[in-house]
Amino acid sequence: MNPRAVEIAKKLSPEQRAGQRILVGVVPSDSPEYITNLIDTQCLAGIFLLGHWTNRSKLEAMLSAVNHVSPQGIKPIVATDHEGGEIQNIRVPGVDHLPSQEALARMSPAKVQAVVTTGARQLAKLGVHMVFSPVAGVIDPRLGVRNKPIAKHHRGFGTDPHLCGQYSAAVVAGHRKAGIISTTKHFPGIGRITEDTDFKSAGITDDKTTRHDRYLESFRMAFDAGSEAVMIASAYYSKIDPGTLGLFSSKIMTDMLRGDFGYQGLIVSDDLGSSVSVFSIDGGHRASKFVSAGGDLAITADPLLAGPMIRALTSTATSASGKKRLVDAASHVINVKLAHSLTK
């Protein structure tokens, strides 16, 4: 951790520190003025692109506006999904179409790194800083395409933990070469569930993965390659923390990631805004539950939840331990921004 990150975080007000914990979704129909006003007035950590951006001029206008706002001297992160195949938000001229991870796994890891580096440089030139990729989760061979979140949509590298790790590490290396922040996902893996947590609240329990499971090797290899961020799954893991969604589990984020793995990077939530798996929880408290369990950066597809999330996060900072957690999480976000010249 850069000591400067802690120094900056401590100088912010509680509300500003809370804002630096939230990334909001942006769709092509949003106006740059609306989004930059949200970032500026709420000191938000940044944005992530949603939907299909096919008009380069419209995309450039949005990213130019966002990259010129700087609340408290801290620039926003611009993130996007760019796994390949079906999952890539940016589809404009000048950005190569990336094959799905399933297709990438038919190449050599060295070739994958080269392909990813080229695409990541194109994204960086547009003003993108962070990519929600790679998907490091290992697919249960007994499920195959019945695994809807990964296998059905060709999002995985396969069923072998070591090979998945090799390819995940290659993607991370490609991002790093281009100066892009990798977000390895969805820890501790969603290859052993049948339903997609974005659309279902049933069929999202992994009853096999354990705390020291061999399927976790792929994540460790991605971390060793330098993945600066990790996204937490919104599934249940009955052999790790029964009854608690992954992104609200201190056993997964604090005990496993920070403890077992010694991971010091940025811990990012899966979507807390529109995912069906979290609908039963008040919108604002989704962020505070995530952060209290050890998370750093909460993402919401619904930008209108930013205000309630800031209020909920601020309310948890009344105790000494709550304030320390808020400062610590904001410091992790700012630490990544310092490394990518998004603040000084």
For the regions a protein language model found, what residue spans apply to each?
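Active-site mouth loops of central-metabolism enzymes
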Residues: 20-31, 99-114, 200-213, 273-281
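Second-shell residues forming the walls of enzyme active-site clefts
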Residues: 13, 57-67, 162-325, 335
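Glycine-rich, aromatic-flanked loop segments that form ligand/cofactor-binding clefts
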Residues: 67-96, 116-142, 164-189
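Hydrophobic faces of well-ordered beta-strands that scaffold small-molecule active sites
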Residues: 19-26, 45-49, 76-82, 130-134, ...
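Surface-exposed, active-site-proximal loop segments in enzymatic domains
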Residues: 91-104, 144-156, 198-199
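Short, acidic/polar
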Residues: 27-40, 111-122, 212-219, 281-289
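Flexible, glycine/charged-enriched surface loops at secondary-structure junctions
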Residues: 321-328, 342-344
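N-terminal hydrophobic targeting/anchoring segments and the immediately downstream early-domain regions
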Residues: 1-94
